[in-house]
C-alpha cells in the first residue's frame, strides 16, 4: 500500500474530535515555527497557505459529537489566520497585519484564477483527473463571493478591535484582547458568509432560522473553543520572535 494511503487510512481510525485537536495543535505550532524562521514574512506565507487550503478543506463535512448536522472542515485553518493577524498586530503593528489580509486575499484569488484556467484546458483522452479537479476547484460563484467578502470584513475588524482593546487596556491583558477580538471576528465571519451564501446570493434562500442554527452557530462552538486554545500560543509567540524583530 502507498504510504500516503496507509497514513490517511490510519488517521481515519481516530476519533473525529481527537483528530481535529491534532490538526489544531499542528497548525498553531506551525504558526510559531514560521514566525521563528521567517519573522513577519513567515506569517504572510502561512496565512496565504491557510486561506487557500482552508477554502479547499471546507468542501469536506464530518460528524462532531456536539452537532446533529454535519460540520464543514476549514475552521482550524481559517482560525489560524486570526492568530497570525493578532501576532502581527501585537509584535509588528497593525499596518503589517493589514498587509497580511491583502496577501491572503490575493493568494486565494490568484489560485482560483489559475485553477479555472487549468480546468479550461481540454483534457487528453487518457486524462483521469479533470472531473475531480473541476469538482474541487470550480467554486459556486455565490460561495466564492461570500467567502472573500466575509474574509476581508472579519479580518479588518479583527485588526481594528484588537488595537482598540489594546489601547483601552493600556497594553495589559493580552488574553483579553486575543480572545475577545477572535471571538467577535469569528462570529462576524460566520454571520457575513452565511447570510450572503445561503440567503442574499442564494436563488433558493434558506430560512433565517436554519441559517442561524446550522451555518452560523454550527461551527461557532468550535471557533470559540479555538479562541481559548490559541491564547497560550499568543503568549509563546514572544519566545519565537526572530532576533531582528522588525
What feature does the model see in each segment?
Residues 132-138, 167-172, 204-209:
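Helix-boundary and loop/linker segments of multi-pass membrane transporters
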Residues 140-154, 218-230:
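Hydrophobic alpha-helical transmembrane segments
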Residues 117-142:
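Membrane-interface interhelical connector segments
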Residues 95-103, 172-180:
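Membrane-interface alpha-helices at helix entry/exit sites of multi-pass transporters
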Residues 1-88, 92-95, 102-105, 109:
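Hydrophobic transmembrane alpha-helices
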Residues 103-113, 180-188:
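Hydrophobic alpha-helical membrane-insertion segments
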Residues 8-19, 32, 170-177, 183-201, ...:
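Alpha-helical transmembrane segments and their cytosolic interface
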Residues 107-125, 151, 155:
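Transmembrane alpha-helix/helix-exit interface in multi-pass inner-membrane proteins
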